[in-house]
Regions:
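Core alpha/beta nucleotide-donor-binding catalytic domains of modification enzymes
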Residues: 1-163
C-alpha cells in the first residue's frame, strides 16, 4: 500500500460518508499550485476512473504576487501530464472603497471566477483542497472572533456546489 493509494482510499471513504460526489459527476478542481490543491488534483486523478468522474481544472490568477504567472504555468503543465483539461481564470481584485481587505476581496473574486468556470464546463461540483491544518486555523480564527457553536465546526465538507 502506497501513501498515495492510502490517501485516495481515505478520501473516497470521506466522499461517500458525506455524500460529496455522485458517480459520474462532472467536477471542477480549483488548483492554486500549492501542496493542498496539488494533492487534491492527484487524488481526484486517482479516483476519477472508479467514480466515473469527469474532472476539469481551473487556476484562478489573482496577479497579486510575482510568482502568479509561474503558478499558472505549473498548474497547466501538471494538468496536461494528468490528461485533464485546464484553463486559467484571471481576476481583478477590488482595491477601492468600499473594501473589505485584500484577503476578503480576493476570496470574493476567486469564488465568482470558480462559479463562472464551473458553469462553462458544466461542473456540478467545485473541489477545493483543505488540510487538517486549514481546519484548525479556521476554528481558531473563528474562536478569536467570538464565534458561536456553528463556527466551531470549521470548514464544511459541502457548501452549495463546493466540496
Amino acid at each position: 500500500v502506497t501513501i498515495a493509494s492510502s490517501l485516495a482510499g481515505r478520501v473516497l471513504d470521506t466522499i461517500r460518508r458525506h455524500g460529496m460526489l455522485r458517480d459520474g459527476e462532472r467536477v471542477l478542481a480549483a488548483v492554486s499550485g500549492g501542496a493542498d490543491s496539488v494533492a487534491l488534483l492527484d487524488v481526484l486523478g486517482a479516483l476519477r476512473a472508479s467514480l466515473g468522474l469527469a474532472v476539469s481544472v481551473v487556476h484562478v490568477h489573482h496577479g497579486l504576487r510575482p510568482e502568479s504567472d509561474a503558478d499558472a504555468e505549473f498548474v497547466l503543465a501538471l494538468s496536461a501530464r494528468l490528461g485533464l483539461p485546464a484553463h486559467v481564470e484571471r481576476v481583478a481584485v477590488k482595491r477601492a472603497p468600499p473594501w473589505d481587505g485584500l484577503e476578503a476581496e480576493s476570496r470574493r473574486a476567486r469564488h465568482a471566477a470558480l462559479q463562472r468556470a464551473a458553469r462553462a464546463v458544466g461542473a456540478t461540483r467545485i473541489a477545493t483542497g483543505h488540510t487538517a491544518d486549514d481546519q484548525a486555523e479556521t476554528v481558531l480564527f473563528r474562536i478569536v472572533r467570538g464565534t458561536g457553536l456553528a463556527g466551531l465546526a470549521g470548514i464544511p465538507y459541502r457548501r452549495d456546489r463546493f466540496i
